A protein has these predicted regions:
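Low-acidity, Ser/Thr- and Arg-rich intrinsically disordered low-complexity segments
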Residues: 1-28
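Compositionally biased, intrinsically disordered low-complexity segments enriched
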Residues: 7, 14, 24, 44, ...
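N-terminal Sec-pathway targeting helices
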Residues: 30-33
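Bacterial N-terminal signal peptides
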Residues: 35-46
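Sec/Tat signal peptide C-region and signal peptidase I cleavage site
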Residues: 48-53
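Beta-strand-centric surfaces of beta-sandwich/beta-rich domains
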Residues: 54-238, 243-378
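Extracytoplasmic copper-binding redox domains, predominantly the cupredoxin/blue-copper superfamily
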Residues: 378-481
Length: 481
């Protein structure tokens, strides 16, 4: 059973304090004399209250998450909280090993993680930005490795009785079974009142059942797939921070204000790794490499918004190639202010964009994935098509997903034909496009589930299950009329 581990660090705005944790004895090792060591510990334990702001930093871990060779895991557990009342001013997450050391992308990738506050009994009910969905997402990141940052004087209010859950996606790039831990670090202001912020998760695809959507492909070179959704603001206030999550082939993610002529309030631009970045070297490629950073908006003054007014969230992706399961999500933090201006004043002069990675490229060529199999020594290798017998079918056919294999692995159907994939395994599967003329993207399929799709564009579709990416392939040929 996965467990959590906690360490705590306390600091004041005026002076730095030593770490108060099970290894506080390291202070003694560095002290030259026992008397100095004793004085330091007594000062930490019995120091009088101070007027300066006090912050505590908690380092917590969830795990282990066990991953088989090249597998993808989707943990959705309840997780430990700091059990402190106060205001979160900073939070980050990463993948570490059992010793707390960062794991390289070549071993395990944190594709995304979201922390959701379910509140506590008798407290204010926490809800998402979509009606009927319990819990308040308050921090998330993906390959962008974004940190929750807020301007000075602001914080996300938490109660020591709150319950948190986590939704994460981890991808293994190792043949051997491995274990990983999700480490999350939280800084909480505990001694003074800050201006509270409300987190809002806004998506370009609105309140669809899933947070991802599909770019079908087939557009002209350089063309854009544009998805847009309006979100009514639940409170009046000021946007003081905003992060973003996008996938491979994203071009931008914007928030615009229709009542002020559709002006752009926030423009989240993706930043891509250099051609030799580790994100492009991992094998097998389980998904199209995403941006290594996205522009993170900050402003102490904030952008005024009024309750009920719509803000438009627009995600733009390459439309030439098919891109299944993309995301366009912005996380905005709004400080309540019932007197927020209705005027379309200039945007705050103190606004700035923070980058988790300073260096990178502003754009990359869109791409699709190769199929990846294993050689005789268990090493990943690129393959041109699925291995195994072929079946020629007519207008409709059912493909079984059984023993973590497609049956049949090679299939030919007539133009306009319908393929129905049927999962017979207890393990979950997904059918997704690696490369081909149009997108294929099934939901996660449990035993007995089916997914059907009609094919109106001729060509070769290489498909795989990214939960079992090196063993579970299908090559589908759609014959022209």
């Amino acid at each position: 059973m996965a467990k959590s581990r906690v360490s705590v660090r306390t600091t004041h705005d005026s002076v730095a304090s030593p770490i108060i944790s099970p290894d506080s004895s390291s202070i003694c090792v560095r002290a030259r004399r026992a008397a100095i060591c004793t004085a330091l510990l007594l000062a930490c334990l019995f120091a009088p209250a101070v007027a300066d702001a006090e912050q505590q930093t908690f380092t917590m871990r969830y795990g282990p998450v066990s991953l088989g060779g090249y597998e993808t895991a989707y943990p959705e557990p309840l997780v430990k909280t700091p059990k402190r009342s106060g205001y979160i001013t900073k939070m980050s997450a990463r993948i570490v090993d059992r010793h707390g050391r960062r794991m390289p992308l070549g071993d395990v990738m944190l594709h995304h993680v979201v922390f959701i506050n379910s509140g506590h009994r008798g407290g204010v009910r926490k809800m998402s930005s979509c009606p009927g969905r319990p819990g308040e997402p308050f921090y998330g990141t993906g390959e962008e490795t974004q940190t929750l940052l807020l301007p000075p004087g602001y914080g996300y209010r938490v109660d020591r009785r709150d319950r948190w859950r986590m939704i994460a996606m981890l991808m293994s790039h190792k043949l051997e079974q491995t274990k990983a831990w999700i480490e999350y670090r939280i800084t909480i202001e505990t001694s003074r009142k800050l201006t509270p912020v409300r987190p809002l998760w806004l998506r370009a695809n609105g309140c669809d059942p899933t947070s991802s959507y599909t770019v079908p492909g087939g557009g002209a070179p350089g063309s854009d797939d544009v998805r847009s959704s309006d979100w009514a603001m639940p409170i009046s206030g000021r946007i003081v921070a905003a992060g973003a999550h996008m996938h491979g082939s994203a071009k931008r993610l914007t928030i615009t204000q229709p009542r002020c002529g559709g002006r752009t309030l926030i423009d989240h631009r993706p930043r891509w790794g250099a051609s030799n970045d580790a994100v492009y070297k991992v094998r097998p490629l389980l998904h199209e490499p995403g941006p290594i950073a996205a522009g993170y908006f900050l402003s102490r003054k904030g952008i005024p918004v009024r309750r009920g007014e719509p803000l438009n969230v627009t995600g733009v992706y390459d439309a030439q190639l098919a891109h299944p399961a993309v995301m366009s999500i912005t996380h905005i933090y709004v400080a309540r202010d019932d007197k927020a201006s209705m005027a379309c004043d200039p945007l705050p002069a103190d606004r700035r964009i923070d980058w988790s990675r300073k260096l990178g490229r502003n754009s990359v060529a869109p791409m699709q994935l190769p199929l990846t199999g294993l050689d005789d020594r268990g090493r990943p290798r690129q393959i041109a098509s699925a291995q195994g017998p072929s079946v020629v079918a007519g207008a409709s056919v059912t493909v079984d997903l059984e023993r973590s294999l497609f049956s049949p692995p090679n299939l030919s159907i007539a133009l306009g034909g319908v393929v129905t994939w049927r999962s017979l395994d207890q393990e979950r599967h997904v059918v997704i496009l690696a490369n081909g003329p149009r997108a294929v993207d099934s939901p996660l399929m449990r035993q007995g589930a089916t997914h059907a799709q009609r094919f109106d564009v001729a060509g070769t579709y290489n498909l795989f299950c990214y939960l079992h990416p090196v063993t579970m392939h299908q090559t589908l040929t759609v014959r022209p009329e």
